């Protein structure tokens, strides 16, 4: 049986190219401090060195892609690993001697925190489905960010060619105007083409409401006769950006299709999608973040992770002062907020609850957040009981 001194804690300051590992014993004495290249052979050597003691507990400050190899090897060798948030490391570093910041010091802080605290979340190797959904949803977020950048650049260039044409359409929501910009970018070109020919040209490219798009474009073109400086070069850039935007939309569609197909291989997909406002994309985001829900004891813990459970800020006689937490998963909060907003727009219990909160004097955003918190409880109960969503609670239906 191991004694108190047979147990060690290894803190790892993880990085992309290399990690730094520091081991401490139960008395807080440093046993070793070493640099470890992010390579299988060196990580295995570190594991074997640490396992010379009877019991080893590991702690890392990064749970993302940089530590994937490290975590996979630790889990494969049956090691216990916990996650020490970077915010904790940053705050606790100030309690140590000296103002310097090094990888070795951070690793020592991580090891000490793991030694003194028992409430850090354990890390395990996620299922292949969860890993795949994380990759796909992260890639989708990158594609959406690229799309926003392209649209902003496109609108900026159009303003320098014809401000009226830039104002005429919502290029982020309609495909037709973007298709038009692949061929016609200037007021003069649009006026020469005319409404009839432009409608025919758009119709051949299967643009929805081609006549409306053509009429609005020609109307905007007729408001400007002057040629602005740099128009010749700007038109080429607009044409190029329009082609890029159309190609990017196809990539997003392909990615969404893959997300949908992958998500629906999960046994919980049907349950999650049965809840109003939770489509395949938001459902995939949910599974990618929470995994199998084993890290949450109850719905309150899940709501806390999503930043939907207020935390107290009491002092002395000042009590009942609640505010939004600072540490929570932004994407998880976003998906519950968006699903609540979608569900609120349709008749049903979500809209009834939203209107009830509005009647109590809450602002729109406050009522939506309150609804999102309520829906966390509902989704948790659905997954726990493995049942689909029903407008009325099960007890009411039975009665």
Curated annotation (Swiss-Prot):
Keywords: Transposable element. It comes from the Bacteria. Signal peptide: none annotated. GO terms for molecular function: DNA binding; transposase activity. GO terms for biological process: DNA transposition. The keyword Heme does not apply. It holds the Pfam family DEDD_Tnp_IS110. InterPro entries: Transp_IS110-like_N, Transpos_IS110, Transposase_20. The keyword Nucleotide-binding does not apply. Belongs to the transposase IS1111A/IS1328/IS1533 family. This is Insertion element IS116 uncharacterized 44.8 kDa protein.
């Amino acid at each position: 049986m191991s004694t108190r001194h047979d147990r060690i804690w290894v803190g790892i300051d993880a990085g992309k190219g290399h990690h730094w590992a520091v081991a401490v014993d139960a008395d807080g004495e440093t046993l070793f401090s070493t640099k470890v290249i992010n390579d299988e052979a060196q990580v295995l050597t570190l594991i074997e060195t640490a396992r010379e003691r009877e019991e080893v507990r590991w702690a890392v400050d990064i749970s993302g892609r940089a530590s994937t190899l490290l975590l996979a090897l630790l889990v494969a060798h049956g090691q216990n690993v916990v996650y020490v948030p970077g915010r904790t490391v940053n705050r606790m570093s100030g309690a140590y001697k000296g103002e310097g910041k090094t990888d070795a010091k951070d690793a020592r802080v991580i090891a000490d925190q793991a030694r003194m605290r028992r409430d850090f979340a354990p890390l395990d190797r996620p299922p292949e489905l969860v890993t795949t959904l994380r990759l796909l949803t992260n890639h989708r977020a990158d594609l959406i960010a690229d799309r926003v950048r392209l649209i902003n650049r496109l609108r900026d260039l159009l303003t320098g060619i014809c401000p009226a044409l830039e104002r005429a359409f919502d290029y982020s929501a309609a495909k037709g105007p973007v298709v038009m910009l692949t061929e016609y970018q200037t007021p003069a070109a649009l006026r020469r083409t005319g409404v009839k020919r432009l409608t025919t040209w758009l119709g051949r490219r299967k643009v929805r409401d081609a006549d409306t798009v053509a009429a609005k474009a020609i109307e905007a073109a007729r408001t400007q006769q002057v040629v602005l400086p740099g128009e010749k070069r700007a038109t080429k850039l607009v044409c190029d950006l329009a082609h890029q935007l159309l190609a990017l939309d196809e990539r997003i569609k392909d990615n969404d299709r893959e997300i949908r197909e992958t998500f629906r291989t999960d046994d919980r997909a049907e349950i999650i999608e049965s809840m109003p406002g939770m489509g395949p994309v938001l459902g995939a985001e949910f599974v990618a973040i929470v995994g199998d829900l084993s890290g949450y004891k109850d719905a309150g813990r899940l709501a806390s992770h999503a930043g939907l459970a207020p935390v107290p800020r009491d002092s002395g006689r000042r009590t009942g002062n609640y505010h939004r937490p600072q540490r929570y998963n932004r994407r998880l909060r976003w998906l519950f907020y968006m699903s609540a907003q979608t569900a609120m727009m349709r008749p049903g219990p979500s809209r009834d609850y939203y209107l009830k909160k509005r009647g109590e004097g809450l602002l729109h955003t406050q009522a939506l957040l309150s609804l999102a918190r309520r829906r966390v409880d509902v989704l948790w109960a659905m997954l726990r009981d493995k049942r689909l969503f029903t407008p009325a609670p099960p007890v009411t239906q039975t009665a």
